[in-house]
Amino acid sequence: GKTRFAMRMGRVLSESIPTLYLNLEGYSGLNYYLPEESGMNLGDLLYYMKQESINPVWKISTLISHMNGVDYIAPIRAEQDFREVTKEEWNQLLDLILEKSIYKVIILDLGDTVDGLYDLLGRCSKVYTPYIEEGAAKAKLNQYEENLRSAGYGEILKKTVRRRMGKPRNPVALEASASKITEFPDGERKS
């Protein structure tokens, strides 16, 4: 559902603008969609960002993989390592990629265990929220939206697009949706 949608959006966007897919979930399951990676991953880039003797910008290109029209950096494999990344580090990572690499759009496939989730959502120009037509799923979506409001992040809902999952979507509709990801308020392209 959600990951497949994010990857398809990455494919569509990458046809017209340099786009990078990042999976920020504790348990990404990305090896279902992409080849198993035993090499370096997003955790290595975060490590390089902390080292004064290593320029992390040079490492970005060595960490990029490409599959089915999507550029991506393999996600952090160990969930405990993922949980140790702070919201400041996530923000520094996004800034580094957007300011120092070729990528103009980053597709974030977010899970609820990422530190600073609401801050990351706040940076996005569009937030796609998938859901299924099922009672418990709707209750979870309503609870998520209420949590955003009560935590002072209600503005995120104004740029949220709900996407019903379960039935294959029309590729033309997906392309039209993908084209709506445009500008970050300060003029930089972000997602």
Regions found by a protein language model. Name each.
Residues 16-72:
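Phosphate-binding loop that captures ATP/GTP phosphates
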Residues 4, 37-40, 88, 115, ...:
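Charged, alpha-helix-enriched surfaces in structured cytosolic catalytic cores
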Residues 24, 75, 186:
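Active-site donor-binding loop signature of nucleotide-sugar glycosyltransferases
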Residues 52-67, 72-110:
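Cytosolic-facing regulatory segments adjacent to core modules
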Residues 1-22:
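Walker A (P-loop) phosphate-binding motif
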Residues 92-184:
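Conserved catalytic-core segment of NTP-binding enzymes
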Residues 29-30, 81, 115-117:
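Flexible loop/turn segments at secondary-structure boundaries
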